[in-house]
Amino acid sequence: MTRILGIDPGSQRTGVGIIDVDATGRVSYVHHQPLVLLGADDFPQRMKLLVLGLADLCREYEPQEVAIERVFMARNPDSALKLGQARGAAISAVVLRDLPVHEYAASEIKLAVVGRGGAEKQQVQHMVGLMLNLKIKLQADAADALAVAITHAHVRATANRLGLSARQAWGRK
């Protein structure tokens, strides 16, 4: 059994989702929560809250691998920069724990979870709930975090069947 931490980075609210995946690629729900970063006085303090929150989650749930959504180009350059910085802080937090990080674009995640790279957020939320047999409606950041973890679980399962690493199976170095 492998535990995967999925991260949907944000500068105000970061979604985290944790799943377990068995050797056959079957996924099961473990935990999800938002890391709400708005309580801090300034942006660097929000990044500190993000790093500390991820460290606490890693200590409590002991993931073995991490999957994170890649940054997309936002309309507002300042928002894109802050999102990139939040993503960097999240990656730093888990790399300091020697966890391997796997990155997926939003379109790759939607394709893996819904079957269509241009799927709507509501479709992702619905499919994640079905795949993990959840009875609650997930918020978008939680669904996205769990979706990136599920995407990595699927890539991992395919890689295992082919005798490849997850990076090789996804065509990355």
Swiss-Prot record:
The subcellular location is:
Cytoplasm
Translocase found in the keyword field? no
Which GO terms fall under biological process for this protein? DNA recombination; DNA repair
Q: Which UniProt keywords are given for this protein, alphabetically ordered?
A: Cytoplasm, DNA damage, DNA recombination, DNA repair, DNA-binding, Endonuclease, Hydrolase, Magnesium, Metal-binding, Nuclease
User: What's the name of the protein?
Assistant: Crossover junction endodeoxyribonuclease RuvC
Q: Please name the top-level EC class of this enzyme.
A: hydrolase
Quaternary form?
Homodimer which binds Holliday junction (HJ) DNA. The HJ becomes 2-fold symmetrical on binding to RuvC with unstacked arms; it has a different conformation from HJ DNA in complex with RuvA. In the full resolvosome a probable DNA-RuvA(4)-RuvB(12)-RuvC(2) complex forms which resolves the HJ.
What start-end ranges are recorded for coiled-coil regions in this protein?
A: none
Q: What GO molecular function annotations does the UniProt record carry, in alphabetical order? A: crossover junction DNA endonuclease activity; DNA binding; magnesium ion binding
> What EC number(s) does the entry state?
3.1.21.10
Identify the gene encoding this protein.
ruvC
NCBIfam families named in the record: ruvC
Q: Any idea which positions bind Mg(2+) 1? A: D8, D141
Main location class: cytoplasm
Q: Name the reaction it catalyses.
A: Endonucleolytic cleavage at a junction such as a reciprocal single-stranded crossover between two homologous DNA duplexes (Holliday junction)
Organism equals Stenotrophomonas maltophilia (strain K279a)
Note the superkingdom of the native organism: Bacteria
